[in-house]
Amino acid sequence: LIGLFNQPKKVYLDIDTWKTLPEEQLSSGLAETIKHGCLGDKELFEYLEKNVEKVLECDGEACEYIAKKNCEVKYKVVMKDERESGLREVLNLGHTVGRAIETVSDYRLYHGEAVAIGMVAQARLGEKLGFISHENEQRVEKLLERAKLPTKIPDYIDRKALVKKLYTDKKVRDGKLRFVFQKEIGEMMCFGENQYGKE
């Protein structure tokens, strides 16, 4: 297996292809877009609050806007941390819980659906820890719901299996779970030099 750390010279986006996707897939993709707004672009988050239905209807202007913003957010993070030494960990917002749910559900949930549930779980935990206000936690949850994404762990998920799966996450250190947290809307919590995960 060979991996390269070369960045693309150009990114091409075919918005017309989005129109061929079923609504569940569009919603699933929107989870990552909402995540990008939460972790690095308040303007994107606020745009989605006003226009999420247009995106689901594949409005050309709305889709072009979020496609461009998605690329910009990810580019900023990846170019500052090409080799995944710290900052890039912020792209895992919602993924600690989300990946575990996705696996334990035996992939009955799309990736974005599982990430949406994980984002709500991490926002609620972040609220308890004082990183995000109740108002902003509710904004995240409501936007995910408007994007037609689940926000609660389905009843069929075995809770014991889920907890066990959480401990296989790549961010676990010395047997301790670590989460990344958003700071209100549009920023990430930093817990020291190049430290974005918290036990």
How does the language model describe each region?
Residues 1-53:
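A glycine/threonine-rich phosphate-anchoring loop and its flanking beta-alpha core
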Residues 2-6, 82-83, 171-173:
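Solvent-exposed alpha-helices and their adjacent loops that cap or buttress functional pockets
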Residues 5, 12-13, 92, 180-182:
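Short beta-strand segments
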Residues 7, 87-88, 177:
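A generic hydrophobic-helix recognition signal that picks specific residues
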Residues 9-11, 114, 178:
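Structural motif
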Residues 14, 119, 185:
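Residue-level signal for inorganic ion chemistry
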Residues 31, 131-199:
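C-terminal charged capping/lid subdomain of soluble metabolic enzymes
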Residues 46-160:
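Active-site segments that bind and position negatively charged phosphate/pyrophosphate groups
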